[in-house]
């Protein structure tokens, strides 16, 4: 369970909370968010903000008000739906024998592709060409993610299931290719990329 740092003694006046409506209320593209914190700090932030950005569009502001007033049950339902999708994709990759850490938030997972001997980009391009499944190479998200791919589960249950089937076929072919290479090439040539 998540515990807000602001709930600890003496921390409310030392905490800044920044959030938006994109994920919680499915308002992606509306470009509206908010910040909570000590009044004195927020006043200083407003001085900078008012000269660097325009206000959120009126329709976005009304949408946010409606979301806060009447959409909490919908938000809870979406949260449960995404938890089911997260579990499905996580278990799917585990079932394929891929190393993966179950995320606690976000709308994507990062399975490891290290054992297949391809870079994230090579893996992503081949997967798209061979199985028509789009993933993002992990190195697009910074150093240390070179041996991972990012897979979104912000889609239907059916698409997640079908994607896992297709990725399963793809990694099986990669494993067969690797075994075939191992028969004919010296061990140090196969694993030189590491």
Regions found by a protein language model. Give the residues of each.
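PLP-dependent class I/II
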Residues: 1-194
């Amino acid at each position: 369970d998540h515990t807000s740092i602001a709930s600890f003694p003496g921390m409310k006046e030392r905490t800044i909370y920044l959030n938006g409506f994109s994920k919680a209320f499915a308002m992606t593209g509306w470009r509206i968010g908010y910040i909570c914190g000590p009044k004195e700090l927020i006043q200083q932030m407003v001085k900078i903000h008012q000269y660097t950005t325009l206000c959120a569009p009126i329709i976005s502001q009304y949408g946010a008000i409606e979301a806060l007033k009447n959409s909490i049950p919908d938000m809870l339902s979406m949260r449960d739906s995404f938890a089911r999708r997260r579990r499905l994709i996580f278990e799917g990759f585990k079932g394929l024998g891929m190393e993966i850490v179950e995320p606690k938030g976000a709308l994507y997972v990062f399975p490891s592709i290290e054992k297949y001997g391809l870079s994230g980009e090579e893996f992503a391009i081949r997967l798209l060409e061979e199985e028509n499944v789009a993933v993002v190479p992990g190195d697009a998200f910074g150093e240390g993610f070179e041996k991972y791919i990012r897979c979104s589960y912000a889609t239907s249950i059916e698409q997640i299931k079908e994607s896992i089937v297709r990725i399963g076929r793809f990694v099986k072919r990669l494993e067969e290719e690797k075994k075939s290479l191992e028969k004919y090439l010296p061990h140090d040539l196969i694993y030189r990329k590491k």
